[in-house]
Structure formats: C-alpha cells, structure tokens
Curated annotation (Swiss-Prot):
Record protein name field: Zinc finger protein 32
Keyword Cell wall biogenesis/degradation: no
Zinc fingers typed CCHC-type, residue spans: 244-266
Chain intervals with Basic and acidic residues compositional bias: 50-65
Main location: nucleus
PANTHER family for this protein: ZINC FINGER PROTEIN 142, ZINC FINGER PROTEIN 322A
Zn-finger segments (C2H2-type): 76-98, 104-126, 132-154, 160-182, 188-210, 216-238
Amino acid sequence: MFGFPTATLLDCHGRYAQNVAFFNVMTEAHKYDPSEATGSSSWDFQSSFRREKLEQKSPESKALQEDSPGVRQKVYDCQECGKSFRQKGSLTLHERIHTGQKPFECTQCGKSFRAKGNLVTHQRIHTGEKPYQCKECGKSFSQRGSLAVHERLHTGQKPYECAICQRSFRNQSNLAVHRRVHSGEKPYRCDQCGKAFSQKGSLIVHIRVHTGLKPYACSHCRKSFHTRGNCLLHGKVHTGETPYLCGQCGKSFTQRGSLAVHQRSCSQRLTL
C-alpha cells in the first residue's frame, strides 16, 4: 500500500513480533503492569527491558552499542587520586599535577607549562598579541576567559555567589579570595616577619616595606609610593580634586577615610 518492498515489511514485522514476545516475557517475569506505571517505575522497567535485550545481542552488536553516543564509555582513572576522565589525553595532562612535569617551555623566558595551550597563551605576554576584543568598549585581551570576565563589567553579571553572605562576584577567583574573610584563612606568609595575608597581592605590597621598594612615582613631584592606590590618592593634592562630599554640610575631601572621620564629628555637632 505504501510502496515498501515486501521483504522489508516482513523483516520489520518479524522484529516487531520478537520484541512484543520478549516484552510479554519480561512483563510476567518482573510482575509489571503497564496500566499502573508512573514516572520512574515505567522508566526503570524500560531500562531493564533494553538492558536484557542488549545482553541477548552478539558481542559485535554490544561493542557497537557501547561506542554509540549516550552509552557509558570507558573511563580512565588516576592511580594517584582516583579522579576519572573520559579521554586518555585528559588523564595524561592531569597526572602532571602529581608528577610536577612541565614539558612545554617558553623559549624566551624559560617558564614551563603542563599543557601546550597554556604555553601558547603565555607567549602572548612576549608578543603583545591580544586576539580577544570586547565588542562593547574595544578593549583587547590575551585570553578568552579574561574577556568573558571583563564583559561582565558591562552586563553587571555576577554569577558567583558566596553561600554564607550572598555577596556576588564576577569571577570564581574573587569569590575564593572573599571566602577567606569568613574562614579566616591566610595562606600567604611573609618570610621576613611571619605576617600572613589572605591575598597574594597584599603580601607583595607588604614585602615592599622590608625591601623599601616604591615603584609608583608621582608625576608632579616625583614622590614615590608602595602602592598605585596611594600614588593616585597623593595626586589629588596637586589637582585639588576632592570627590568625597559630606551630605550634611557640603564639605569635600580627597580621601574617603577623611570624609568618614569628618561625618562622625559633623553628625554630633548637628545633634547638639
């Protein structure tokens, strides 16, 4: 009627009859009533039905089934920590964390990396290449991930939330640093005096107290500072900029801290 070859119809009918017969056997064996099936029980029975059908297939058919998408495939386990990977190459890369092996070396500075992709990204420091550009403001980046984080400045997206105080962050590393406020963890310790810090950047700035290094110089008077923030703050002395305004009396200040001190005394005067 539909124009299919007779042999095809017979073959299809034969397979259908076999499946119906097998389904009936399974129904009896597992005491399954399709009319009473709901949700997971129906799914579990169908899964069992497919599994037992698979066991009846030839080894060749089962091998093809196991290689098909959606079917559990071979996993590669790390002998050191037990972590599993779907690809052998991913396991090899992971194992270098345990062995410390870094076979990819930068020819310009000698720094080594576990993965070739990391070396390629690093080399952009030397070449100045920044292939990832923000469509919003035109700023360019050497890494795709850095661009993704930057774009959240424009969108306001902060997908990483602290489970303790619900404060949100643009990237995962900032969230990790923030969590140390709650845990009290300070993993970065000064070798000179033993003082510990929650952020690596804070340790770097602190070390300058011991070394005397002041890499940020004022363009007006050449006075130098340990941090860029202090240098920018000092620059307001020359420009006369006073961006911090008291909402009660209108007086303005160059530093936020100075405004805070003033507001305490200002509010006391107004209440008298």
